[in-house]
């Protein structure tokens, strides 16, 4: 016998049931990098937009980078799901026996050689499966990796104001169906710049964080004006955190060897050098165990935890500074004195297990869980998450789909 009260209860339960998740083929992912956002800034600085997105979506207590916890290697890990040894971008600055020139963040000509870039960045994964992708600044996006790029991309210009970066993304999102990207990237450098100059505990770092938060708010408003709120999923990350520096924690290379006798590819906090005369053992002996906060290794003897032992793009001699210590030269310290400048206030690149190196992870949108807080996890798993959100099959990677499964609706 049909009971009106039971019918009313069933109707109420149906109305209260959470709406079904958005189909993956209609989902859009916007991957936002806030360079240098440390794991604890969300609580310390209370940015309104990011705090709201974190509450409405999935938040991690920290995002663990790869070593060295530098910008280019970790940005490329995020979009490939590969460790540094597997995708090849082992540092911001490196050399390879089979590629001419020195790779650096400022050397666009050398960066353009596709032989540096391994793996399958997600914009290529998406495009190969019939989707459109757009990259508003991301390491690797300016190079044809595997013979292809995103449909839309921009040459990196750190002087481009944040509002123009956001405007470009909104312009792409307002394209008609079929031309509109399903995967987009966006990058902000304000906070990393402030952290390096003034340190992670400075007022300037807080101001930079809130400035970026306002830009993210502009993006969210633009997505709403484009009528895409119910389709857009935000994946907001940082490549690393930031550790404070001090004049009292300097390692001056000149105290142990003449810098002119070596090709120093990388400085701090991971020293990478090759002796000009080819005598690796002599230079290794000059540095080994000379400073209690500098750990020196031959390339083949780098501890397994760092995942880079024997890699041909790693310098023959590597020195790794302890967290908070800075490797420098007498020439650099003299310049600080001459111009009455302070040394850098902060840096990164340290052992990825250091808490100060952990970054930000927020994921919010119709394909993602609401109000979920997860323990810190490695950034190699982000590629699988983003592929799952937009419904594409991931290429081979080092992530574990089980790590991100509970984040999905």
What are these regions (language model features)?
Residues 13-15:
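C-terminal motif of bacterial Sec signal peptides marking the signal peptidase cleavage site
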Residues 17-26:
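Bacterial Sec signal peptide processing site at the extreme N-terminus
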Residues 22, 162-174, 191-232, 282, ...:
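A long, amphipathic alpha-helix that forms part
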Residues 25-29, 56-60, 129-134, 178-184, ...:
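Loop/turn elements at helix/coil->beta-strand transitions in domains of secreted/extracellular proteins
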Residues 31, 49, 211-252:
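Metal-dependent active-site segment of extracytoplasmic phospho-/sulfohydrolases and closely related
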Residues 40-87:
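Short, structured active-site-proximal loop/turn typified by the sulfatase FGly-forming signature C/S-X-P-X-R
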Residues 82-199:
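His/Asp/Glu-rich, glycine-adjacent segments
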Residues 265-373, 377-388:
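Active-site neighborhoods of enzymes that stabilize oxyanions during catalysis
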């Amino acid at each position: 016998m049909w009971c009106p009260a039971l019918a009313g209860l069933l109707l109420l339960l149906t109305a209260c049931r959470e709406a079904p998740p958005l189909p993956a083929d209609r989902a859009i992912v916007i991957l936002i990098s806030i360079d240098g956002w440390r794991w604890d800034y969300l609580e310390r600085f209370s940015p309104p937009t990011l705090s709201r997105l974190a509450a409405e979506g999935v938040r991690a207590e920290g995002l663990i980078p790869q070593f060295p916890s530098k910008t280019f290697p970790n940005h490329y890990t995020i979009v490939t799901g590969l460790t540094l040894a597997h995708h090849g971008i082992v540092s911001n600055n490196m050399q390879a026996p089979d590629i001419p020139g020195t790779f650096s963040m400022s050397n666009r000509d050398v960066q353009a050689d596709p032989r540096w870039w391994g793996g399958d960045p997600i914009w290529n994964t998406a495009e190969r499966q019939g989707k459109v992708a757009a990259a508003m600044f991301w390491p690797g996006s300016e190079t044809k990796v595997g013979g292809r790029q995103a449909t839309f991309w921009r040459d990196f210009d750190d002087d481009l104001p944040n509002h123009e970066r956001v405007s470009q993304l909104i312009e792409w999102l307002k394209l008609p169906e079929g031309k509109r990207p399903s995967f987009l990237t966006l990058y902000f450098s304000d906070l990393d710049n402030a952290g390096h100059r003034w340190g992670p505990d400075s007022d300037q770092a807080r101001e930079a964080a809130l400035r970026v938060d306002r830009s993210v708010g502009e993006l969210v408003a633009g997505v709403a004006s484009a009528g895409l709120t119910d389709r857009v999923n935000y994946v907001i990350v940082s490549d690393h955190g930031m550790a404070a520096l001090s004049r009292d924690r300097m390692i001056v290379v000149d105290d142990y060897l003449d810098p002119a006798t070596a090709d120093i590819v990388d400085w701090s906090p991971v020293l990478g050098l090759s002796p000009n005369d080819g005598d690796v053992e002599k230079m290794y002996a000059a540095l080994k165990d000379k400073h209690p906060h500098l750990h020196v290794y031959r390339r083949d003897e780098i501890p397994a935890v760092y995942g880079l032992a024997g890699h041909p793009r790693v310098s023959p001699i590597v020195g790794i500074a302890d967290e908070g210590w800075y490797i420098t030269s007498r020439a650099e310290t003299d310049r600080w004195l001459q111009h009455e400048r302070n040394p850098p206030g902060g840096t990164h690149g340290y052992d990825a297990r250091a808490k100060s190196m952990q970054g930000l992870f927020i994921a919010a949108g119709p394909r993602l869980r609401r109000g979920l807080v997860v323990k810190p996890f490695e950034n190699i798993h982000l590629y699988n998450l983003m592929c799952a959100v937009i419904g594409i099959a991931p290429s081979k990677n080092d992530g574990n789909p089980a790590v991100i499964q509970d984040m999905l609706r």
